[in-house]
Amino acid sequence: MNPPINFLPWRQQRRTAFLRFWLLMFVAPLLLAVGITLILRLTGSAEARIDAVLLQAEQQLARSLQITKPRLLEQQQLREQRSQRQRQRQFTRDWQSALEALAALLPEHAWLTTISWQQGTLEIKGLTTSITALNALETSLRQDASFHLNQRGATQQDAQGRWQFEYQLTRKVSDEHVL
């Protein structure tokens, strides 16, 4: 005869394994759902914080741009004014040298009474003491490197015997691009 076998520990072991299996089958999906939900919430809150930080940085950048914009515009305007003054000075220096060259062309007994600049034409009027000085002036004006003799105006002798002359000249170098 065989001794009696106690199946109680085996049954308890099987029952415990059975309960563990079904507990795992019911709890695992629940834990998985809770874990996924938690991860999604953490990811969402992290994205929300990142968006908030980016929005704040963008707003701060916009505020700083609004603050610095007038100063930058003022600096740009000052640079443009400085550049305009520099071009004007260069224009004046160019004219100064051209007018000094024109003055050097005048014979000893000739002087200018009026100089005017209108629409690209320099009009000079003056007096000479003799007709030879007037002819020398016209010859030197024709050979001038700065101006081109356009038109000779009226030439007449006044009551004191001086010769009045009038010439219209144009610059050989264009001034249009300077201003």
Swiss-Prot record:
GO cellular component, one term: plasma membrane
Transmembrane portions of the chain: 19-39
Disruption phenotype: Mutants are unable to use DNA as a sole carbon and energy source and show decreased competitive fitness when cocultured with wild-type cells.
Subcellular locations according to the entry: Cell inner membrane
Chief localization: membrane
Residue ranges that the Swiss-Prot or TrEMBL entry lists as coiled coil: none
InterPro entries: Extracell_DNA_Util/SecSys_Comp (IPR052534), PilN (IPR007813)
The organism's place on the tree of life at top rank: Bacteria
Keyword field: Cell inner membrane, Cell membrane, Membrane, Transmembrane, Transmembrane helix
One GO term of the biological process aspect: carbon utilization
Membrane topology label: Single-pass membrane protein
Classification via PANTHER family: DNA UTILIZATION PROTEIN HOFN (PTHR40278:SF1)
Function, as annotated: Required for the use of extracellular DNA as a nutrient.
Name recorded for this polypeptide: DNA utilization protein HofN
